[in-house]
Amino acid sequence: MVVILEHEIPQGSQLYFGKSARLKRRIEERASQILYTAGFEEIITPSFSFLEHQRDTSSREVLRLSNEKNHQIALRNDTTLDVVRIITKRLGRSTEHRRWFYIQPVFSYPTNEIHQIGAESLGEADAKSMLKVAIEIFRSLELEPILQLSNMRIPLLCAEHSRLGLEVFAKMQVEKIMASEEYLGELLQIKNAQDLQRVTSKVPSFLKEELEKLRALAEGIEYPRFVFAPLYYAPMDYYNGIFFRMFEGNSTLLSGGIYEMDELQSCGFGLYTDQLIEKILRHNEG
């Protein structure tokens, strides 16, 4: 039998105290002020929900237990899913508000605790508006991570019209992509607005509309560190079109985009508070 010492906490759970706890509170306060100003209201969803309300009831990631009536209960695993369900199914007659934010953790198997600050604009697929709010939050913290703009529809369409499987784009197997259709190599070279405009005029017609959506998203965004990644693909539970993320090194600090859930097209993002705290503390110590 393995002896568990009194000072140990489960791997993947989070502990903040002193300087780190103060930083966490400062991040949350600044984000909430910006979100309130942008017309969002806060929602705090239950930590528990019925297992049948999860997108994938068989997922090993979901922590589950039973209540006194033997109903299967899940510990909060996806706040976006909960917000959409609760606003549309439970509070639909009580509020017409459609812009909501949350500051709370999600949990996954075995003992992972992930603190998030998220915002959802239900029934509004305005990615540019959401992106500007995300940028403002980082600027309030005097941070400018790299901003990546992508469109999940582009690799999906490329896989459909080429000999390549979607996994080639998910793993970003550059050699296979370059050895395939010429336009795929061109898409790989896109980094800035000039590249995007040049390549859009040369690609097959089935891609032009999706590339135009990327151009429209970037137009008017004043941010010094952003790149286009039109072939970026990461399997997501619901993001299937315009997608953006902000990262530094190997750490993703925020991700978001347009999604459809319960026949409602919406847009949102999630800021990963734990990653952000770690980055700021390391920078201050360095």
Swiss-Prot record:
Q: What does this protein do?
A: Required for the first step of histidine biosynthesis. May allow the feedback regulation of ATP phosphoribosyltransferase activity by histidine.
Its predominant location is: cytoplasm
Record carries keyword Amino-acid biosynthesis = yes
Task: Identify this protein by name.
Answer: ATP phosphoribosyltransferase regulatory subunit
Coiled-coil segments on the chain, per record: none
The pathway is: Amino-acid biosynthesis; L-histidine biosynthesis; L-histidine from 5-phospho-alpha-D-ribose 1-diphosphate: step 1/9
Binding partners and assembly: Heteromultimer composed of HisG and HisZ subunits.
Q: Name one GO biological process term.
A: histidyl-tRNA aminoacylation
GO MF annotation, one? histidine-tRNA ligase activity
Annotated localization: Cytoplasm
Miscellaneous comment text of the record: This function is generally fulfilled by the C-terminal part of HisG, which is missing in some bacteria such as this one.
> InterPro entries from the entry?
aa-tRNA-synth_II/BPL/LPL (IPR045864), HisRS-like_core (IPR041715), HisRS/HisZ (IPR004516)
What does the similarity note say?
Belongs to the class-II aminoacyl-tRNA synthetase family. HisZ subfamily.
List the gene name.
Answer: hisZ
Keyword terms, alphabetized: Amino-acid biosynthesis, Cytoplasm, Histidine biosynthesis
Protein source organism: Wolinella succinogenes (strain ATCC 29543 / DSM 1740 / CCUG 13145 / JCM 31913 / LMG 7466 / NCTC 11488 / FDC 602W) (Vibrio succinogenes)
